[in-house]
């Protein structure tokens, strides 16, 4: 089958036969293994459908992708979130079962294009399977694995099994290019998400009333999207609230994590939990304590001063090994994009109640640290560029 490109031609026995994209019903097989991938995948599907009304989709993902595609996921990302060596080992049978499902569906569906969204541990192995068993399919990767931070050895697999890579951070173009692999920066989808939300009508008074919040300033608590990291990070965040009686501490619950799970960690404290409203919460927050991940960048795009935290197993040993495992001096996207420390990172044994309170005190009230952070946020926003990441990526994938 010819790629979906307007004006493509095929030469057969002296005749030139034109082929046009609207004559070809394209099939897209997409894998997104996390909540963030579900969001980006849903927008990518919507943009592809705008360009290709007859497109067919089969995917591993979540509810948002299901809404965009009009079909249910083969496997929901909730059943694919395994963090850490021990957790992977305990669920190895389930992981192999999911991998077999992906392989079987690929060969049953026979897609024209395979789109992999982040989730490199699973996706790079799947890319290898695709190239060995369905070489006619184009393998596109949206949101490059963070090889500049760790596991650079994966670049070998990318060069071999991934046809095109679309990145969401400007510096990745140079990083990959200097290692002999050309990638395309399409913009950052978080810029799209936050910009779209900020352009919507929003009633802060109504938001507070609907969620049982009074007029006191709010500290947002973003503890991550996976149960394991939430369980590790949230207890200290909850304890922190007892030191700030003039503020409301509010947890932004992750999609796909049950209310009972959060309630078991919060107990009888005065910390509130809201569901499906992370962006509204950040829009009204005075400050935030954020588990390292995409949420740190989203918090910066909302111009909310933050303390970044991350609890890892191993404590001091983990921090001693960090330079050997992670090639960047920082873990938060805010600092990595800025190329300097903009937000304080409290990692492993440094993430304590006392140290978190010390850092939060510096940004919760107006002062030099808070203003400096907000200024740095503006610089980061300029570097990331304009909205339209998902649309640009979809256009490139569609045209082939």
What are these regions (language model features)?
Residues 3, 23-400:
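Nucleotide-activated sugar donor-binding and catalytic core shared by glycosyltransferases
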Residues 5-7:
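Glycine-biased, low-complexity coil/linker segments
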């Amino acid at each position: 089958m010819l790629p979906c490109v307007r004006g493509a031609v095929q030469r057969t026995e002296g005749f030139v036969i034109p082929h046009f994209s609207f004559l070809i019903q394209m099939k897209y097989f997409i894998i997104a293994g996390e909540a963030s991938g579900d969001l980006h995948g849903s927008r990518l599907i919507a943009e592809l459908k705008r360009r290709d009304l007859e497109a067919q989709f089969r995917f591993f993902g979540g509810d948002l992708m299901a809404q965009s595609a009009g079909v249910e996921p083969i496997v929901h990302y909730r059943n694919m979130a395994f963090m850490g060596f021990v957790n992977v080992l305990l669920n190895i049978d389930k992981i192999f079962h999911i991998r077999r499902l992906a392989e079987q569906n690929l060969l049953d569906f026979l897609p024209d294009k395979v789109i992999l969204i982040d989730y490199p541990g699973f996706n790079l192995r799947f890319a290898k399977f695709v190239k060995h068993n369905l070489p006619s399919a184009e393998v596109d990767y949206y949101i490059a694995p963070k090889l500049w931070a760790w596991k650079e050895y994966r670049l070998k697999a990318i060069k071999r099994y991934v046809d095109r890579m679309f990145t969401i951070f400007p510096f990745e173009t140079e990083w990959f290019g200097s290692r002999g692999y050309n990638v395309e920066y399409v913009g950052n989808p978080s810029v799209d998400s936050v910009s779209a939300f900020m352009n919507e009508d929003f009633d802060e008074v109504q938001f507070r009333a609907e969620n049982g919040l009074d007029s006191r300033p709010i500290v947002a608590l973003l503890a991550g999207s996976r149960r394991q990291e939430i369980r590790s990070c949230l207890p200290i965040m909850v304890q922190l609230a007892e030191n700030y009686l003039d503020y409301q501490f509010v947890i932004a619950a992750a999609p796909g994590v049950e209310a009972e799970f959060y309630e078991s960690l919060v107990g009888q404290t005065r910390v509130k939990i809201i569901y499906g409203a992370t962006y509204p919460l950040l829009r009204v927050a005075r400050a935030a304590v954020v588990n390292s991940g995409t949420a740190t960048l989203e918090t910066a795009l909302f111009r909310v001063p933050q303390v970044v935290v991350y609890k890892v197993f191993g404590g001091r040993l983990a921090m001693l090994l960090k330079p050997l495992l992670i090639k960047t001096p920082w873990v938060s996207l805010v600092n990595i994009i800025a190329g300097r420390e903009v937000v304080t990172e409290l990692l492993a044994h440094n993430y304590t109640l006392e140290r978190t309170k010390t850092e939060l005190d510096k940004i919760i009230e107006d002062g030099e640290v808070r203003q400096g952070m907000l200024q740095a946020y503006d610089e980061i926003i300029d570097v990331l560029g304009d909205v339209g990441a998902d649309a640009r990526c979809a256009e490139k994938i569609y045209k082939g």
